[in-house]
Amino acid sequence: MKFIITGGGTGGHIYPALAIASGLKERLGEAEILYVGTKKGLEANIVPRAGLRFTTIDISGIDRSSMLKASRSLVKFPRSFFQAWDIIKDFQPDIVIGTGGYVSFPIVMAGTFFPSKTVIHEQNAIPGLANRNLARRVDYALLNFAEAAPYMKAKSMKVTGLPVRSEIFNVQRAESIKKLGLEPNLFTLVVFGGSRGAMTINQAMLEAVERWQDSKMQIIWITGESSYNEIKQQLEERLSLSKRRFLQLYPYMFNIEEALAAADLAVCRAGAGTLSELAILGLPAILVPYPYAAENHQEKNARALLAKKAVEMVIDEFLDGDTLYKKVNELRENPVYLKEMARNMAKEGRPNALNEILDVILTLPDN
């Protein structure tokens, strides 16, 4: 069978797509898969590393900061749609699968005009405009949150959860601690801001990190590539070499599952992909929802877990070094509650999500 998979811009759209691709290959033995992304998205680096055939179309997300910028983004759509049309016409997939991000809209939309079956996966409790529109045309809409269903006027729909990478299931805590050169008996904090980093989290960390240098804890801090050099320079100026040993600084981690498995607590955004991986590993978190996410979906994702006592939450505009320092220390000093959070987070994991998604995808040609 032949599949086109599309999803990009951020890791939250890419990694579920890679999980589906890997699952299809495992189920079918042989599957011809073409991944469609953009040259500027993270997928251009991540997907080829996964060994998948990769091609691109020319499209960018809608910039809502002004009508002029939004108009410029929309002008590109006809071109990207016809690029998508040509790709589908040439490749002739049996099924087109979209996992979100602006690149998936023209690909899946074009797919609905061909004999190919089409399926989308919506990750968030509040669907974006693209998937709301696609839902009316595709053969199947798969959901991570049941709360998304009222927004999706799809022919067929199912709540499956979000597929996570196979590495998440295979990673071991003790082995990860050893690989990363961490001390096995120290409290470990992992801090990251999504695949592109997060300015607010990075700034709060810069304000707080010196206060942790003499404490019995270790930190894995993934800054995002754009902020890495500046943060590294500041730390070198403010912390002596001996004091920096408690801190591991990375611009990006392709093996982030090892950092998550090694950690006792995470500080991060509240994207659906991130939350699904944390849930599988039972890793509690202090969530700082991205304030400009469409429909404010990250805060809604975070509040759902906050109500279940699986996470703590700090609104982005209220996060600073002092708040972060106090939040982390409160949880460090209350291991009983931290373990309760971990148990509650693990209850939210849906380890069978990928199999449910594959079952739907592979029965589509028969319908």
UniProtKB/Swiss-Prot annotation:
It is an enzyme of class 2 (transferase). It comes from the Bacteria. GO terms for cellular component: plasma membrane. Gene3D superfamilies: Glycogen Phosphorylase B (3.40.50.2000). It is found in: Cell membrane. InterPro entries: GlcNAc_MurG, Glyco_trans_28_C, GlycoTrans_28_N. One of its GO terms (molecular function) is undecaprenyldiphospho-muramoylpentapeptide beta-N-acetylglucosaminyltransferase activity. GO terms for biological process: carbohydrate metabolic process; cell division; cell wall organization; lipid glycosylation; peptidoglycan biosynthetic process; regulation of cell shape. Pathway: Cell wall biogenesis; peptidoglycan biosynthesis. UDP-N-acetyl-alpha-D-glucosamine binds at T10, G11, G12, N124, R165, S195, Q298. Its main location: membrane. The keyword Membrane applies. CDD domains: GT28_MurG (cd03785). It is a peripheral membrane protein. Its EC number is 2.4.1.227. NCBIfam families: murG. Belongs to the glycosyltransferase 28 family. MurG subfamily. Cell wall formation. Catalyzes the transfer of a GlcNAc subunit on undecaprenyl-pyrophosphoryl-MurNAc-pentapeptide (lipid intermediate I) to form undecaprenyl-pyrophosphoryl-MurNAc-(pentapeptide)GlcNAc (lipid intermediate II). This is UDP-N-acetylglucosamine--N-acetylmuramyl-(pentapeptide) pyrophosphoryl-undecaprenol N-acetylglucosamine transferase. It comes from Syntrophomonas wolfei subsp. wolfei (strain DSM 2245B / Goettingen).
